[in-house]
């Protein structure tokens, strides 16, 4: 988490103070709402004030831990909603424990805390929306200028055309410099013609620039290092194109990667035995909970699959398929069968959207990810995690390693039931699709954390509940 210069720290502190006051006021409104709607008295004034105060501080602290007050936070609005939801959910759980442990002798309306938490989520979402739209406090909104207007700089223009892709920043334009490939570069109307010399700092201060992104095609002899260093000393962030794209798009652009960046950049710290043991324990607990909740659906699915192809020879309910797992080790994945028994009579094939080999039952269970549930056994075995890159077949992996740089690095973490790539890229069925998905897989490998796993789980639940699967 980065907090920036003193000006930015004051902005962040101001935001936290404002939201503490807002949450306290929401607590007051919630008490009246509960009394009016449910005709239920909340609690005595002293205990009420204590509860509201603790909850308000907890929400802000949780928000701080998930990056809601980070100066350089760039998120889509849906991403901000998820962070607000997580911070309030954590706070709600803690305040429930505190209330039941230390305030168990106080009569508190059973409707109050759920109402308070729900209204807090709603009010914070509305507040953040208008805050970002109006650019108040400058939090989450930064002015950016790109040095370079050639082929590399055009990647930003191509991948960030939509307004939602630029939700957290304002792009002033591109500064062309010597050595840029202008044939593949930026069009004239988006260019800024300014010399990067000792007067460049005046341009930066006059336009209140927060960040400079280096995206020139040729660096040697074209970048004024002293001028850029002076900008950094003045509190302006200077970023590489690869780091900028990683931060803003949630992916690592593979064709921009170079060996020194992989070696020296933060992240990619996958080998940690203590964390691995903790992850396995948490995965087993989660798998047990999911199994207890889903076993009736699994039993019903197995019966329906059995009767759908009851007269077809060798039509099993489950199927096993070899996949490449952690550190390249092979294992057998277990799934409900969603394709015809003879789906691969001619050899391994990429699965495609609207694949004709998928059965009628298979279409439904794939849409709601029910076919993945037997992989809970793979989780118990330690072959898979809940969150991680989806495992591929060895026949495809051999080809992909030959054709895609750094593809093998996705095997540095355990494969998962759900992954960052599956949420951000449509169903892949080719080498080109695998290249795009790898950008998100590498982002996950580099930034693997509990917070990222929680966000992926929340979005995966949305996919399952609303049938946004394959």
Residue spans of the language-model regions?
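A short, structured surface patch at a secondary-structure boundary
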Residues: 351-414, 456-460, 464
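Membrane-spanning helices that line or support transport/gating and their immediate boundary helices
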Residues: 33, 129, 133, 137, ...
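Short, glycine-rich, amphipathic interfacial segments at transmembrane boundaries or analogous
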Residues: 180-184, 245-258, 315-357, 418-437
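C-terminal terminal-structure detector
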Residues: 38, 381, 404-470
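N-terminal hydrophobic signal-anchor/signal peptide
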Residues: 1-21, 126-295
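Membrane-cytosol interface motif
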Residues: 84, 88, 140-158, 313-339
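A hydrophobic, helix-centered structural microdomain
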Residues: 275-342, 450, 456-470
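Signature of alpha-helical transmembrane segments in polytopic membrane proteins
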Residues: 1-139, 470
């Amino acid at each position: 988490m980065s907090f920036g210069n003193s000006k930015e720290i004051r902005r962040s502190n101001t935001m936290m103070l404002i939201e503490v006051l807002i949450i306290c006021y929401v607590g007051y409104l919630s008490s009246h709402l509960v009394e009016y709607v449910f005709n239920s008295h909340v609690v005595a004034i002293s205990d009420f004030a204590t509860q509201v105060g603790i909850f308000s501080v907890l929400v802000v602290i949780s928000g701080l831990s998930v990056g809601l007050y980070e100066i350089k936070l760039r998120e889509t609005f849906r991403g901000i909603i998820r962070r607000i939801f997580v911070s309030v959910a954590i706070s709600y759980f803690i305040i429930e424990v505190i209330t039941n442990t230390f305030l168990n002798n106080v009569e508190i309306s059973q409707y109050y805390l759920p109402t308070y938490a729900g209204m807090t989520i709603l009010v914070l979402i509305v507040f953040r929306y208008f805050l970002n739209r109006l650019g108040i406090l400058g939090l989450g909104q930064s002015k950016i200028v790109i040095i370079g207007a050639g082929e590399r700089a055009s990647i930003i223009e191509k991948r960030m055309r939509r307004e939602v892709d630029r939700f957290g920043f304002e792009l002033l334009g591109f500064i062309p410099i010597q050595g840029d490939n202008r044939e593949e570069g930026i069009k004239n109307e988006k260019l800024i013609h300014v010399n990067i010399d000792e007067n460049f700092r005046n341009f930066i201060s006059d336009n209140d620039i927060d960040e400079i992104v280096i995206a020139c095609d040729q660096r040697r002899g074209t970048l004024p290092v002293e001028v850029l260093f002076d900008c950094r000393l003045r509190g302006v962030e200077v970023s590489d194109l690869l780091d900028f794209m990683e931060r803003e798009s949630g992916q690592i652009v593979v064709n921009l990667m170079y060996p020194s960046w992989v070696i020296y950049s933060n992240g990619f710290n996958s080998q940690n035995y203590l964390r691995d043991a903790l992850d396995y324990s948490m995965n087993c607990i989660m798998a047990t909970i999911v199994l207890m909740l889903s076993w009736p659906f699994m039993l019903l699915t197995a019966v329906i699959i059995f009767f759908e192809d009851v007269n077809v020879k060798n039509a099993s309910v489950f199927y096993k398929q070899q996949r490449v797992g952690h550190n390249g080790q092979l294992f057998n994945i277990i799934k409900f069968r969603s394709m015809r028994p003879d789906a691969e009579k001619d050899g391994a094939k990429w699965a495609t959207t609207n694949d004709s080999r998928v059965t009628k039952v298979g279409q439904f269970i794939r849409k709601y990810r029910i076919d993945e549930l037997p992989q809970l056994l793979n989780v118990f075995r330690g072959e898979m995690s809940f969150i991680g890159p989806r495992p591929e077949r060895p026949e495809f992996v051999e080809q992909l390693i030959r054709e895609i740089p750094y593809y093998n690095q996705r095997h540095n973490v355990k494969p998962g039931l759900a992954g960052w790539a599956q949420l951000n890229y449509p169903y892949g069925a080719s080498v080109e699709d695998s290249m795009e998905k790898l950008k998100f897989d590498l982002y996950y490998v580099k930034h693997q954390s509990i917070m990222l796993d929680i966000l992926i789980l929340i979005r995966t639940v949305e996919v399952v509940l609303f049938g946004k699967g394959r």
